[in-house]
Amino acid sequence: MTLTSKPLAVIVLVMLFGGIFFSSAMGWWVTESTKEPVTFTEGEFAGQANPADIRGSYTFGDIANSFEVAPEVLAQAFGITEGDPSGFAVNELEAMYLESGYEIGTASVRLFVAHYTGLPFDTTDQEIIMPKSATDILLAKGNLSPEQIAYLEKYTVIVDTPVPAEQPVAE
C-alpha cells in the first residue's frame, strides 16, 4: 500500500487537530498558568500547598489564595506601602531592594510564607535574607522552632525603606 501526499496531509491534520480537540475535551489542554503551587504529596502536610513552589510571577493575591497569609501581612513584612497589595508581584521585590545591597526576593517570600503558616521549608545550604519587618511579624506570631529563630537571627537585616518598583502597582 502506498500513501500519496494528499491522504498523508489529511491524516497529519486530523491527528494534529484531533489531538488538540480530544485534549481540550478531556480538560488536559491548558494554555494559561494557573498560579497554583504544587502540594505536598506525603506526610503530615499532604495535600497542602508547598511554599517552595512560589514563583516570582505570583502576586501577593495569588499567595493569599493558596496559603493563609493576607496580602496586607505580606505587604507589611516586605515594606510595600503603595497600591493594592493583592496585585504586587513577588519578582518586583528584588528591584525594590536592589540598592540595599541585599538579595531580598522570591526566596525571602517563600521562607516567610512557610514560617508564617507553619509549613516545612528546607533552608539547608541557603542564605535567605529577611528584612527585619518580616522577622518581627514571624517572631510576634510565636510559632517558630528554636532552629528557625536562630536562622532568622543570622540572616535578618535592617534595610531602609525600599525604593518603589519602577512600574506602579495596579489598583
PLM segments and residue spans:
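Sec-exported extracytoplasmic/periplasmic mature domains
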Residues: 65-69, 79, 83, 98, ...
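Short, structural beta-strand-to-alpha-helix junction motif
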Residues: 56-61, 74, 88-98, 103
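Primarily a LysM-type cell-wall glycan-binding module
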Residues: 43-67, 73-80
